[in-house]
């Protein structure tokens, strides 16, 4: 545990050092730059805004962590995020329910969109033994172009001066309190659920042991193929 923490800390420090080196080469002051970075993002007034903006990154990071801990090298999070956002946007444009129903409905649509896109790579692996390392990367590009096409043509806001969709129904907007968006609460809830499943449930144990030693897992009666697909969908 201590070693993992140390590795992460060293990795972050190296990233800052490399960033500082690039800035020095380009003639910028890295200390001033990093000061402004932290001042803007971590000042008391800006922390709620920073947390709100971090939600998509944290959720996709959790998705990747489940896959990596269980074996699959799923690099398709950017494409899955786009497809989930696109499906949720379509739902928000054509469905209007009370907020208590609309928000969960759109969240479910977003999860389904991402799961279906990841499921394509999972099925290609299951049926044709195609590496998810390659297919998820390729699907990222397809999702990128498909989303770009959808925003520019069928979903384009006619009065807009640049590519964008119309606003979704207001009943689907996450509540906000100042700079704090309630999506942060959803993110924290998702973190607790995923942590519990991966570390405290039978399914999570099977996923982790499958990633560490698939032969041992198979001999122990673990359904490798089923778990692979489930993990990819998550």
Description of each model-found segment:
Residues 22-26, 32, 36-95, 111-130:
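Single transmembrane alpha-helix segments in multi-pass membrane proteins
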Residues 1-13, 127-139, 225-226:
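Alpha-helical transmembrane segments and their helix-start/interface "positive-inside/aromatic belt" motifs
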Residues 193-231:
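Membrane-helix/interface signature in polytopic inner-membrane proteins
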Residues 29, 142, 216-217:
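Hydrophobic/aromatic residues within transmembrane alpha-helices
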Residues 2-7, 39-52, 76, 101-105, ...:
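Interfacial loop-to-helix junctions that mark the boundaries of transmembrane helices
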């Amino acid at each position: 545990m201590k070693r993992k923490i140390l590795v992460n800390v060293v990795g972050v420090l190296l990233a800052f050092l490399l960033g500082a080196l690039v800035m020095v080469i380009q003639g910028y002051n890295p200390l001033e730059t990093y000061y402004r970075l932290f001042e803007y993002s971590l000042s008391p007034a800006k922390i709620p805004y920073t947390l709100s903006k971090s939600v998509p990154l944290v959720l996709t990071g959790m998705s990747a962590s489940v896959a990596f801990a269980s074996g699959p090298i799923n690099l398709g999070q950017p494409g899955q995020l786009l497809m989930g956002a696109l499906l949720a946007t379509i739902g928000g444009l054509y469905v209007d329910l009370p907020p208590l129903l609309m928000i969960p409905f759109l969240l479910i649509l977003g999860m389904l969109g991402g799961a279906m896109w990841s499921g394509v790579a999972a099925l290609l692996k299951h049926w044709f033994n195609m590496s998810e390392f390659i297919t998820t990367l390729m699907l990222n590009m397809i999702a990128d172009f498909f989303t770009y096409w959808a925003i520019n043509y069928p979903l384009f806001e006619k009065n807009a001066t640049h590519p964008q969709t119309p606003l979704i129904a207001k009943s689907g907007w996450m509540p906000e309190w100042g700079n704090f968006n309630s999506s942060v609460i959803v993110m924290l809830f998702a973190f607790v659920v995923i942590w519990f499943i991966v570390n405290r449930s039978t399914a999570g144990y099977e996923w982790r042991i499958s990633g560490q030693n698939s032969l041992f897992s198979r001999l122990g009666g673990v359904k490798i193929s089923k778990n692979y697909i489930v993990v990819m969908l998550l």
